[in-house]
Amino acid sequence: MSKITAKDVRKVAQLARLDLPDDQIATYTEQLEKILAYVAQLEEIDTTNVKPTTRAVEVVNVTRTDEVSATPVREELLNLAPQREGDFFRVPKILAE
């Protein structure tokens, strides 16, 4: 693994649009070195028999079967509204013109 330089840290900061003061370059250089060393360690792990996952816990979507049912007539629904205008519900204005 190649050593991380101050130039590398400045480049990463620039790509991330971070304003990194010069007095913090050494700190971030050391931290990036440790992070990349850890990633290199992870790359050594044999994962050939590990099933790929996207979550640590299995997520199951709870669904029900669709059932056809009678729906109210449009006119009945429109009559339930406090105000209507033709075939539309009338609602209070919330955006200024």
Curated annotation (Swiss-Prot):
Signal peptide: none annotated. GO terms for molecular function: asparaginyl-tRNA synthase (glutamine-hydrolyzing) activity; ATP binding; glutaminyl-tRNA synthase (glutamine-hydrolyzing) activity. Keywords: ATP-binding, Ligase, Nucleotide-binding, Protein biosynthesis. GO terms for biological process: glutaminyl-tRNAGln biosynthesis via transamidation; regulation of translational fidelity; translation. InterPro entries: Asp/Glu-ADT_sf_sub_c (IPR036113), GatC (IPR003837). Its EC number is 6.3.5.-. It catalyses: L-glutamyl-tRNA(Gln) + L-glutamine + ATP + H2O = L-glutaminyl-tRNA(Gln) + L-glutamate + ADP + phosphate + H(+); L-aspartyl-tRNA(Asn) + L-glutamine + ATP + H2O = L-asparaginyl-tRNA(Asn) + L-glutamate + ADP + phosphate + 2 H(+). PANTHER family: GLUTAMYL-TRNA(GLN) AMIDOTRANSFERASE SUBUNIT C, MITOCHONDRIAL. Heterotrimer of A, B and C subunits. Belongs to the GatC family. Allows the formation of correctly charged Asn-tRNA(Asn) or Gln-tRNA(Gln) through the transamidation of misacylated Asp-tRNA(Asn) or Glu-tRNA(Gln) in organisms which lack either or both of asparaginyl-tRNA or glutaminyl-tRNA synthetases. The reaction takes place in the presence of glutamine and ATP through an activated phospho-Asp-tRNA(Asn) or phospho-Glu-tRNA(Gln). This is Aspartyl/glutamyl-tRNA(Asn/Gln) amidotransferase subunit C. It comes from Prochlorococcus marinus (strain MIT 9303). The gene is gatC.
